[in-house]
Design a protein with these regions (language model features):
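Alpha-helical scaffold segments that flank or form the walls of functional sites
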Residues: 28-42
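Active-site beta->alpha loop and helix N-cap motifs at the rims of alpha/beta catalytic domains
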Residues: 37, 43, 48-151
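Charged helix-capping and loop-helix junction motifs
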Residues: 25-27, 60-65, 147-153, 177-184
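Short, well-ordered secondary-structure micro-motifs
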Residues: 20, 92, 145-147, 174-177
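Polybasic, low-complexity association/targeting segments
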Residues: 2, 145, 161-164
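Catalytic alpha/beta core domains of metabolic enzymes, predominantly
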Residues: 162-192
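Conserved, mostly hydrophobic/aromatic
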Residues: 16, 36, 106, 163
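N-terminal small/glycine-rich loop or linker at the start of catalytic domains
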Residues: 2-21, 76, 128-138
Length: 192
């Protein structure tokens, strides 16, 4: 008998940041973070870590000062931040490590033409930071089945804590595509 466990990653502040140019009022972000933490949400994703390509605002260009301002320095170790491999810094020293107690996870998105390089960077990032690393293949509705299988051939060699698919632009119709993705999800589960 295997016990199923579901951990929730709330991405409202990060994903919703696109609606407000990543410029949430700090009081709202603080109250939202506290609510999600009180409800037992395992990870609360605040925004993008030190990226500036799409916005100069603080929830797209997160740093430790902003993270601590949102969390109140409570040290709950439940913050997630996202990086987009295409745009992120490739200097490992630009990332938080497990020596702090706010950020627990880095989720990295990767385009299909960068999976190999993104994988190699994420492996180094995991080793350097000691944090939970989630690897997201995004825009997956633009992949062929062979491309998704090839991407999984690469990333399943890792010890990433999570591997996921992202429907970046809202084209995924699980009603129609569930059986297609079922194959790929089984590959991930069986590799564990």
């Amino acid at each position: 008998f295997m016990e199923n466990k579901i951990d929730i990653i709330d991405v409202t502040l990060r994903d919703g940041g696109f609606t407000c140019d990543f410029n949430w009022p700090m009081l709202f972000a603080q109250e939202y973070y506290d609510l999600m933490s009180t409800l037992g949400v395992k990870y609360v994703e605040l925004g993008y870590w030190k990226q500036t390509n799409k916005s100069q605002n603080r929830f797209f260009n997160l740093n430790m000062d902003t993270v601590r301002e949102v969390t109140g320095g409570k040290g709950r170790n439940n913050v997630s931040v996202m990086i987009d491999y295409h745009y992120c810094s490739k200097d490992l020293n630009d990332y938080p490590t497990n020596e702090q107690n706010e950020i627990k996870m880095i989720r990295m998105t990767c385009r299909k033409d960068m999976v190999k390089e993104g994988y190699e960077f994420a492996v180094k990032l995991k080793k350097h930071t000691g944090l939970v690393i989630a690897f997201n293949l995004f825009n997956t509705t633009n992949y062929t089945d062979n491309e998704l299988d090839s991407a999984l051939d690469i990333v399943l060699k890792s010890d990433f804590d999570m591997i996921g698919f992202a429907d970046t632009h809202g084209h995924l119709n699980l009603y129609e595509d569930i059986f297609r993705y079922e194959h790929f999800l089984h590959r991930i589960i069986q590799s564990d």
